[in-house]
UniProtKB/Swiss-Prot annotation:
The lineage of its organism: Bacteria, Pseudomonadati, Pseudomonadota, Gammaproteobacteria, Enterobacterales. Pfam families: ABC_tran. GO terms for biological process: cytochrome complex assembly. Keywords: ATP-binding, Cell inner membrane, Cell membrane, Cytochrome c-type biogenesis, Membrane, Nucleotide-binding, Translocase, Transport. It catalyses: heme b(in) + ATP + H2O = heme b(out) + ADP + phosphate + H(+). Part of the ABC transporter complex CcmAB involved in the biogenesis of c-type cytochromes; once thought to export heme, this seems not to be the case, but its exact role is uncertain. Responsible for energy coupling to the transport system. This is Cytochrome c biogenesis ATP-binding export protein CcmA 2. SMART domains: AAA. SUPFAM superfamilies: P-loop containing nucleoside triphosphate hydrolases (SSF52540). It is an enzyme of class 7 (translocase).
Amino acid sequence: MLEARDLHCERDERTLFSGLSFTVDAGEWVQVTGGNGAGKTTLLRLLTGLARPDGGEVYWQGEPLRRVRDSFHRSLLWIGHQPGIKTRLTARENLHFFHPGDGARLPEALAQAGLAGFEDVPVARLSAGQQRRVALARLWLTRAALWVLDEPFTAIDVNGVARLTRRMAAHTAQGGMVILTTHQPLPGAADTVRRLALTGGEAGL
């Protein structure tokens, strides 16, 4: 279980959110919503331990995150707004960098992400959407329980969004957790996703 307790965050003397508390249990996914500058990415960075809140605490499995960073990071898949891939490498080589023991599974993961036939193409030659798919192919390889995804559908077409949404649904059905930001609808998942709205210093589930 991931828990946020009374989180408070300020940026440039402006309160992004205050008194924010919620939990994400096994089998749940949460969509963080809000306008530009509402603090969506900042909240995800707090939840992953990449930044510290100005008040409150994040807990993982009942322990303060700052005390269990190693075990937490073994349980975490974080994909930020930028793909975080190496453009000099091919799609296959990028996945091998993150999952060196899964060589036999890489082609299937890339195919699931819509990159069949592009396995050995340098990422620099791929479109923005294809580069995003390289990063998201990790969803078919990772063994992490908690997925935190910042705008995963950027530059992804409708069919790709549907495929990725099905993968997230399968992950939560198996007891995994997903937290994501997106402005796009989640096809077939509207009834199962909780929404956390950040609105001008306040938040509501």
